[in-house]
Amino acid sequence: DVYKRQGTNGKGSLAAMTSSILTAAGYKTGLTISPYVVDFRERFQIDGEMIPPRTLANLTEKVLDAIDAIEAEGGEKPVEFEAVTALAFLWFAREKCDLVVLETGLGGRCDATNVVPHKLVAAITKIGYDHMEVLGDTLDKIAAEKAGIIKEGTVVVNYPDQPAEAMGPILTAAAEAHTSIITPDKDDLTLLRGKRLENRIDY
């Protein structure tokens, strides 16, 4: 089962928090993030632990072999993010993760992570102007691309202060997928303790 997050700002933070919550709840949880900060292996995690170096090397060979086969048959060579996503899927499947938290790379509709046919949750953080040369030059165009992660049977969690211009495509995608949108109420959130690198809240 997959929990997927999209948006312009806050995807990485949301992914990390969600993964930590699911792990603490007892689920074996896979996580992909992009980009990494220090170590490339940060992009692949299970229960907060990065992929082991030897496992990364072995799975990289498998992915490269698959890419060679695709090219030999005249197919289009996958870009780096597509190859990295395939590697993550291989590892998560091999380790039999209960849940997986995926961070999209670019957009959503045509993103490599969108090959997943069913997602439990699609979380959309605040949408802003991002990769305009690919996604479009207006918020509604960008939102339409990002809302492409919404599938039938997926619960949508939407940022509470989403720009009005971005809401139309999100509502349309949810209606077409016959799914509901949950918009959290920030008034239900209480900051218990706030520090530079740590926040504790009650929701």
Question: What residues fall within each predicted segment?
Answer:
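Short, small-residue-biased leader/transition segments that mark boundaries at the very start
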Residues: V2-Y3
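Acidic, Mg2+-coordinating active-site environments of NTP-dependent enzymes
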Residues: E71, E95-T104, K119-Y203
